Design a protein with these regions (language model features):
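Short beta->alpha connector loops
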Residues: 1-5, 107-108
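Active-site-adjacent beta->alpha loops and helix N-cap segments on the catalytic face
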Residues: 3-11, 15-16
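Active-site loop/helix belt of alpha/beta enzymes
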Residues: 19-20, 26-139
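Active-site loop ensemble at the mouth of alpha/beta enzyme cores that anchors a bound cofactor
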Residues: 76, 108-182
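Short Gly/Pro-enriched turn/cap motifs at secondary-structure boundaries
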Residues: 81, 140-142, 184-188
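C-terminal accessory subdomain/extension
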Residues: 155-229
Length: 229
């Protein structure tokens, strides 16, 4: 918004600093950002004389494509977003607006977005850990985010209860994956308990035994913990 960046300019002037900014382009996520093309150019021209704002370039996030399961459809959708961003970059440069940084691509799209030779910066964050979600969404990094729980109860040979509920391991977006157990049928969570349902009997795990989960979605898990080991 124009009034927001004008306020940023006044604050920067007060503290005698220059702010580096990227304008966000809405390439299909429909969450924030300017529409591609002429609206971006118009905005740049409206703020180009702000003394304490340094325009560095553009950013976009094709997050609406991250969870697309069909590989061909995912490539097509990301291509459409990249084309909008590329056309906007070209329009700005043709009108004398320097575009130094072009930022985009996320943990669920970087393997495709990076192939377009457009982006100067990849925004992927969660993929440094890789959880169940990003593994499903095409991340190629090795999973490295796990949570250790304890078995608290064995009500039956086909059911395992752990001390891991929503307070430590959220499961409402993407379910965490129990490790080292065969024939897991499903997992469910309440506030303070995790329940693992098995397709066949397992009598080896007993109360007090450790059991590791691969985190379902790091974004809604990491902030709950003060320390990573």
């Amino acid at each position: 918004h124009l009034e927001t960046i004008q306020l940023m300019n006044r604050i920067a002037e007060k503290f005698a600093v220059t702010l580096n900014v990227l304008l966000e382009v809405n390439t299909g996520r429909n969450r924030a950002g300017l529409d591609p093309g002429q609206p971006v150019l118009d905005f740049y021209q409206a703020i180009r004389d702000l003394e304490f704002i340094r325009n560095r370039g553009l950013m976009a996030w094709e997050g609406h494509t991250a969870t697309i399961a069909d590989p061909d459809e995912k490539v097509r959708s990301i291509s459409a977003s990249m084309e909008k961003l590329s056309a906007t970059v070209s329009l700005c440069r043709e009108n004398g607006i320097p575009i130094e940084i072009i930022s985009g691509g996320g943990s669920g799209t970087y393997t495709i977005s990076s192939n377009f030779k457009l982006l100067t910066e990849i925004q992927a964050g969660g993929v440094i850990f890789t959880d169940v979600a990003y593994s499903k969404w095409g991340a190629e990094t090795r999973p490295s985010l796990f949570l250790r729980s304890l078995v608290t109860s064995r009500p039956s040979p086909k059911r395992i209860i752990t001390d891991t509920g929503w307070k430590t391991l959220p499961g409402w977006s993407v379910a965490p994956k129990p490790l080292g157990i065969d024939a897991v049928d499903s997992v469910s969570f309440s506030s303070e308990h995790g329940t693992i349902h098995l397709a066949k009997e397992n009598t080896s795990l007993r109360p007090g035994d450790p059991l590791d989960y691969m985190v379902g979605y790091g974004d809604n898990t990491v902030f709950l913990h003060e320390r990573l080991y």
